[in-house]
Amino acid sequence: NDEMGFERGFGALASNEINVYWSGNTDQVKGDVYYLNIPITNNLLGTRLFFIPKGTAKDYENIYTLEDLRKSKKVGGFGRGWSDVTIWKNNNLPYLEKENGNWAAIFTMMAKKTRGIDYFSRGVIEILPEKAAIIDKNNLALEVEPNLIFKYNGDFLIYLNKKNGELNKIIESALLNAQKSGLITKTVEEFWKKDFDELNMKNRRVIIVPN
């Protein structure tokens, strides 16, 4: 999905060029596009870690609550239309919204330390792949903040086009069965165990972000 691009992906689904698109919660849904309210990673998208400029981890050592983050005046960076924007706004947390579809530019903006972005909030299952594919590959002076988890209700969802009625029924039935049987939970725990261990998830401080 990232390779296709957020806005282009929803456009392709709306025009029925593709039949299925997965993404986080968004206000970009319109027309014949709708989503299945079945979280497909057990809220891992809403389990957030921060990318930060190298050498700034000490700035987060005394953050234990949402109020601490608010008082720090640290500014988060987000792509346009992301659900995070509404959540950050409702919690009076400073943020900047990237106005075009190239959300990956936030990495370079943050690395320069001159564009007003202090951290980039990403889902826990996005962190290590993006670190390898973007940060390490481009030798950006960024790192993963080591001690915090910010958690809100949010997950990847399956988006469909209403025009594909029969196919949509098959997809929805399969996802419901996977949810009820515990297959989604089992898959999540097995597939991302190595990432969870590497990111030291069990020993991080959890801060709940209301949404």
Q: Where do the language-model regions lie?
A:
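Periplasmic-binding protein-like
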Residues: 44-49, 135-172, 194-211
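Extracytoplasmic/secreted proteins, especially bacterial periplasmic and envelope-associated proteins
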Residues: 8, 83, 87, 105, ...
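Short helix-initiation/N-cap motifs at beta->coil->alpha
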Residues: 1-11, 97-112
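Extracytoplasmic small-molecule ligand-binding "clamshell" domains
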Residues: 1-33, 171
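Hydrophobic/proline-rich hinge and linker segments of small-molecule sensing/allosteric domains
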Residues: 37-65, 158
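Alpha-to-beta junction loops
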Residues: 12-23, 74, 112-122
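Bilobed "Venus flytrap"/periplasmic-binding protein-like clamshell domains
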Residues: 52-92, 105-106
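Ligand-binding clefts/hinges and TM-proximal coupling segments of bilobed small-molecule sensing domains
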Residues: 79-90, 175-211
